[in-house]
Design a protein with these regions (language model features):
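Binuclear metal-dependent hydrolase catalytic cores
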Residues: 1-172, 181
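Cap/insert and terminal regions of metallo-dependent hydrolase folds
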Residues: 177-229
Length: 229
């Protein structure tokens, strides 16, 4: 989706952690034949100022990138370590054939990646494994090429995770709470992407109603919901 002449966001998936339909679920949505009720795990490509930035890389990544409008990628931003956001990282190997591929995440996320993918980070890695540069970030803005990225710390139940601001876009997923300080920083942003899991309460994700309340506080020009059942 083109927001303006500079920024484009392509949603690779907007589903919850199990995807939609969910295995073993026989609710109306999961039995639906409507293609709009088919959702892969939440991920997006942000194209801005010539850079192609992937946000999250879940278990559906290979399928998602093969059907994307372009498969060019320059970097990966991770929101957090949960499997539905990192399980596709091994499939980044084609992007590291010619250069080491950068991944930006909180230090605790990168440390867990080293534990989960030890074959990528040995002194003498096996030929063909992904060559990854794990870049630790804090709450300060950082550069991905010529693009400034600002972390947006939010809570996922009791887990501190990151949303990201890239130019006119803020992308927030898996959030259950955003502090007043972060809300203040986002007020008036042109384009907001935020999770809205369902109408029923959930301990670690915003409901549709809670997401709408955040939207009313931030007052973006355009809002898209993601990470939905």
């Amino acid at each position: 989706m083109n927001y303006n002449s500079e920024l484009e966001i392509e949603f690779l998936g907007t589903g919850t952690s199990t995807g939609v339909p969910s295995i073993g679920c026989h609710c109306k949505v999961c039995r639906s034949k409507d293609k709009k009720d088919k959702r892969l795990r939440a991920s997006a490509i942000v194209r801005y100022k010539g850079m192609n930035i992937l946000i999250d890389c879940g278990p559906d990544f290979r399928q998602q990138i093969l059907r994307a409008s372009s498969d060019n990628l320059d970097a990966l931003l991770l929101t957090h370590i949960h499997y539905d956001h990192v399980a596709g990282i091994d499939d980044l190997r084609p992007y590291s054939f010619n250069h080491i591929f950068p991944i930006y995440a909180r230090p605790e996320v990168n440390q867990q990646l080293r534990t989960n993918l030890p074959y990528c980070f040995t002194k003498h890695p096996y030929p063909g494994v992904p060559r990854l540069d794990l870049v630790d970030i804090d709450n300060n803005p950082f550069m991905v090429g010529n693009v400034e990225v600002t972390p947006i710390p939010v809570m996922h139940d009791k887990l501190l995770i990151n949303g990201y601001r890239i130019g006119p876009l803020a992308y927030i997923t898996d959030c259950s709470y955003i502090s007043p300080e972060e809300i203040e920083k986002l007020k008036g942003i042109p384009l907001l992407v935020i999770n809205a899991l369902r109408h029923r309460p959930h301990h670690s994700h915003m409901t549709v109603e809670q997401a709408l309340e955040v939207v009313s506080q931030i007052s973006p020009q355009v809002t898209y919901f993601t990470h939905m059942c």
